[in-house]
């Protein structure tokens, strides 16, 4: 037996061999098949020599899981989790353990993809529909989205919607009440500048004095005051002003709904419905509007349709509004949102039910009443005379109060004008009220919580005016009234999970989506209280662990990208695009070239690119691609020269969206630079760059990084995501700042793009762990293995399907595109048929019809083993044989396993199945693999047209699920 060295024995838990799917023997077998001697040899065959890095990354060695956990545990301990009363949109909450364990920490929920294949996503679609129902019930409006990124960006989306739908077409002013949260105003101003809107800020009642297209109000406001806006809203709407409201979701359990006051749009954060603060995120925003505005809504909307058997089925509705179809004409660039967190919030509402929510909200309000009564009894003056959970105090010795608060390990809100704010939440206890009295008043105040409570009960609370007390019922649907025991809740969550296909069942080979392993060790720290329970606006000296983690992650990303600086703030890839384009815009403005507003975008680009360019106030000019899928250099040269005076930038993806490393990438960069433009390199395909090349080395100026793709943050069924941007030094002064927390950059005065200074900081430990565990060598090997897996799949499938684009040496990058158009022409079988048939084989379909209609784009990632790759290949080969039977006339074009896919249990139990020209076994057990491990779609193919023509986006009768 060969003896191992001690060093080798010490590497027993190295993460690298857990993350990469094929073991060394499988890799060699695959290399032999594709015709390469080694991973380095394959890399040399694929990546153009001119852009290959000539040095290794300088991140450090890979390490074991135990070592990585120990290190990040040390960082977590540097965070001081004080009791937070800061509020401002972020509140303490108690995550029900049944949700924490069965949803937040469950790969069946967090590794799924956006439900573009609804037949295998009915579980989370139902959970999201519940979220929409909660949003509609509490706001009193007609139609809700499936989630937006955060409250502040939802405000910006509300402003954009207001302009789209307002009948005051000549108006260009958006009014913002001066008592909204400052971070919300910050993000709104950033967006308004790009659109050329004027933002007027003033007291709410002054809104009627301006010619507006829209207005924004906070309910309750930043000081805690609750205002009845009914008359004001009526007056504004009579002037064709679109009224938008930022609302607190917990307060709406007790308060009159904004919809009942006449609001057009209501939005806010669902964070306090069972989602930790996470130093700023991720959290789902709710967004609800009147039915008449449905075509102008941003983001995804879940609707009810029917399948081919006539059964109710859920799907994403009205997708023609979205960026992947409408491109620069889309309502929004929203792509990845916050579905996992929306699901948590919806389950929170289901678990507590209307009565439980009312108890929680009433307790918060009662404690606030007690706190206010005690302070007023001692002569303390309050700014507000109505409240739900927040009081604002004036006339205090701020320095003394702050000192006592810090000594008691609590954080209050201290405004610049000397006002001290206190916001209570679900976690507040009696003892906390006593401690607050001690901090605010000092020792010896003599106040007694029980006595104050008895006084309030006897006299009646006046904190919520009678006219603002909610009178209508909420959450009356049976779903919110039958799962209050943990047993029932656990089983309900499991029933929904079992309807969905996620990475814990099989490979998800979606091209341009990088559905790699989200390792358990990477996910563990996210639930730790030291990371989960930090308020984003706490004093930074309490967040030393977070600060160090963000600094280390940023330095690693700088090294990986070849840029000079990184901004962590954008909380999705689309937001990263927007933030990067804003930096370019501000750079041109600083040079006296504000007229540079044209963005060149290849016709193959992802739909978010033109949508983001439009958000940044740019005009899109599309450049052509040649027959090989590369940017047409002659067309680019001509258009760059034509618009040279006004050229702002080009947005290009690398490797291209066609899955190849374009040889001319540096020439493309040079052409744009020669005409005064900047190069935005979309980081969607960064998984094919890490350790081999980099955007900065190639010649780009700015990129966003999808941490939820390349750096292992899970997709969550449609979010969360993170989209930090890397920039060259000349753009660094122009990245996003923040009005509340100064990140310590030159860009402090730049507007924000997200509500929190570091975006969804709560999931940054995932990417930190991913990079720390893999190290320089592991990151490079992951990229090389992704190339190997893609080329292995490509070569295997090329024997059965045409491969549309290949690069040098007949290779692809990390993904390949198979062309199904000849099959459709010969047999009538479509890419949709093949996608749905893959469900019967236990697979999620690859990306359909992007970047070319009638194709499938396959990205296997480095995490899939040869065994799983072969299972997928076998399924595709088997499907090709089925297509051949249709081509030969053995099966009718309108009655075959592909046309009828996917197949359900109901199908094979139906006696009428006997009339089909294929057997039940062919329908549901088409391969040996699924006979022993079968995933069952729960609905047949869904009728999208019916769903959009009969739009219904609320909970359906419970009998439909029984």
Curated annotation (Swiss-Prot):
Q: What is its EC number?
A: 1.4.4.2
Catalytic class of the enzyme: oxidoreductase
List, separated by semicolons, the cofactors it needs.
Answer: pyridoxal 5'-phosphate
Q: Name one GO biological process term.
A: glycine decarboxylation via glycine cleavage system
The PTM N6-(pyridoxal phosphate)lysine maps to 709
SUPFAM superfamilies for this protein: PLP-dependent transferases
Subunit info here reads:
The glycine cleavage system is composed of four proteins: P, T, L and H.
Descriptive protein name: Glycine dehydrogenase (decarboxylating)
Q: Which organism is it from?
A: Shewanella sp. (strain MR-7)
Starting at the broadest rank, the lineage of the source organism is:
Bacteria, Pseudomonadati, Pseudomonadota, Gammaproteobacteria, Alteromonadales
């Amino acid at each position: 037996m060969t003896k191992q060295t001690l060093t080798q024995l010490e590497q027993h838990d190295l993460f690298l061999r857990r993350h990469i799917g094929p073991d060394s023997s499988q890799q060699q077998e695959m290399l032999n098949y594709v015709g390469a001697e080694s991973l380095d040899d394959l890399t040399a065959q694929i990546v153009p020599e001119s852009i290959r890095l000539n040095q290794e990354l300088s991140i450090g060695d890979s390490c074991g899981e135990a070592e990585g956990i120990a290190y990040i545990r040390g960082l977590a301990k540097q965070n001081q989790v004080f009791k937070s009363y800061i509020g401002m949109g972020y509140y303490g909450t108690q995550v029900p353990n049944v949700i924490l364990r069965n949803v937040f920490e469950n790969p069946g929920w967090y590794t799924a993809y956006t439900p573009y294949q609804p037949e295998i996503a009915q579980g989370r679609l139902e959970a999201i529909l519940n979220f929409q129902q909660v949003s509609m019930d509490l706001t009193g409006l007609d139609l809700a989205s499936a989630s937006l990124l955060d409250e502040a960006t939802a405000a910006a989306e509300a402003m954009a919607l207001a302009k789209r739908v307002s009948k005051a077409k000549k108006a260009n002013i958006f009014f913002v009440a001066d008592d909204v949260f400052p971070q919300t105003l910050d993000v709104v101003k950033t967006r308004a500048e790009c659109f050329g809107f004027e933002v007027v800020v003033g007291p709410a009642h002054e809104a009627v004095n301006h010619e507006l297209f829209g207005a924004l109000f906070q309910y309750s406001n930043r000081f805690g005051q609750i205002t009845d806006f009914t008359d004001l809203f009526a007056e504004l709407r009579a002037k064709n002003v679109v009224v938008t409201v930022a609302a607190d979701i917990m307060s709406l359990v007790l308060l009159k709904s904004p919809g009942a006051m006449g609001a057009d749009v209501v939005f806010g954060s669902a964070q306090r419905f069972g989602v930790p603060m996470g130093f700023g995120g991720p959290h789902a925003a709710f967004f609800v509007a009147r039915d008449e505005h449905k075509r102008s809504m941003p983001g995804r909307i879940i609707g009810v349709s029917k399948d081919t058997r006539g059964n109710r089925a859920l799907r994403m509705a009205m997708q023609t509004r979205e960026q992947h179809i409408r491109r620069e004409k889309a309502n929004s660039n929203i792509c990845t949102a916050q579905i996992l967190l929306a699901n948590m919030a919806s389950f929170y509402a289901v678990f507590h039910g209307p009565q439980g929510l009312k108890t929680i909200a009433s307790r918060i309000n009662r404690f606030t009443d007690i706190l206010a009564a005690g302070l007023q009894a001692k002569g303390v003056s309050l700014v507000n005379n109505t409240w739900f959970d927040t009081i604002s105090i004036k006339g205090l010795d701020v320095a003394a109060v702050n000192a006592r608060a810090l000594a008691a390990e609590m954080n209050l809100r201290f405004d610049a004008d000397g006002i001290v704010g206190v916001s209570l939440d679900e976690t507040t206890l009696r003892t906390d009220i006593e401690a607050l009295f001690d901090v605010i008043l000092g020792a010896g105040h003599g106040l007694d919580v029980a006595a104050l409570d008895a006084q309030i009960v006897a006299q009646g609370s006046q904190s919520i005016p009678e006219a603002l007390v909610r009178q209508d019922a909420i959450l009356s649907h049976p779903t919110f009234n039958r799962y209050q025991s943990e047993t029932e809740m656990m089983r309900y969550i499991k029933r929904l999970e079992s309807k969905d296909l996620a990475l814990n069942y099989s490979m998800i080979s979606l091209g341009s989506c990088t559905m790699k392993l989200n390792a358990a060790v990477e996910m563990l720290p996210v639930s730790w209280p030291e990371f989960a329970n930090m308020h984003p606006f706490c004093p930074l000296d309490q967040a030393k662990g977070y600060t160090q983690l963000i600094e280390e992650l940023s330095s690693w990303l700088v090294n990986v990208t070849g840029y000079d600086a990184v901004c962590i703030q954008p909380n999705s890839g689309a937001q990263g695009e927007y933030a990067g384009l804003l930096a370019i815009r501000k750079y041109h403005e600083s040079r006296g070239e504000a007229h540079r507003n044209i963005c060149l975008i290849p016709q193959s680009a992802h739909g978010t690119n033109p949508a983001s360019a439009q958000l940044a106030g740019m005009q899109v000019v599309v450049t052509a691609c040649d027959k090989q899928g590369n940017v047409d250099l002659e067309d680019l040269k001509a258009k760059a020269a034509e618009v040279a005076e006004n050229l702002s930038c080009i947005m290009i993806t690398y490797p291209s969206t066609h899955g190849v490393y374009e040889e001319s990438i540096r020439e493309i960069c040079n052409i744009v630079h020669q005409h005064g433009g900047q190069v935005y390199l979309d980081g969607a395909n960064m998984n094919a760059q890490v350790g081999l090349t980099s955007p900065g080395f190639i010649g780009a100026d700015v990129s966003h990084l999808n941490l939820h793709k390349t750096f292992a943050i899970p997709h969550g069924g449609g979010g969360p995501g993170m989209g930090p941007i890397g920039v060259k030094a000349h753009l660094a002064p122009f990245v996003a700042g923040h009005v509340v927390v100064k990140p310590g950059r030159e860009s402090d005065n730049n507007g924000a793009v997200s509500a929190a200074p570091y975006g969804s900081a709560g999931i940054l430990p995932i990417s930190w762990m991913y990079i720390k565990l893999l190290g320089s060598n592991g990151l490079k090997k992951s990229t090389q293995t992704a190339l190997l897996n893609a080329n292995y799949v490509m070569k295997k499938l090329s024997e059965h399907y045409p491969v549309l684009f290949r690069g040098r040496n007949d290779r692809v990058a990390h993904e390949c595109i198979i062309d199904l158009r000849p099959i459709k022409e010969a047999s009538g079988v479509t890419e949709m048929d093949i996608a749905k048939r893959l469900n019967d084989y236990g697979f999620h379909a690859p990306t359909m019809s992007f970047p070319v209609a009638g194709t499938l784009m396959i990205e296997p990632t480095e995490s899939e083993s040869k065994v799983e790759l072969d299972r997928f290949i076998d399924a595709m080969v088997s499907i090709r044989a089925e297509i051949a039977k249709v081509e030969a006339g053995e099966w009718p074009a309108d009655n075959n396993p592909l046309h009828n896919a996917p197949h359900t249990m109901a199908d094979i139990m139906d006696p009428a199945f006997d009339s089909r020209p294929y057997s039940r076994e062919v329908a549901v057990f088409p391969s040996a693999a699924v006979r022993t491990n079968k995933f069952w779609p729960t609905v047949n193919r869904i009728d999208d047209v019916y769903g959009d023509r009969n739009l219904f986006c609320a909970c359906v009768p419970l009998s439909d699920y029984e």
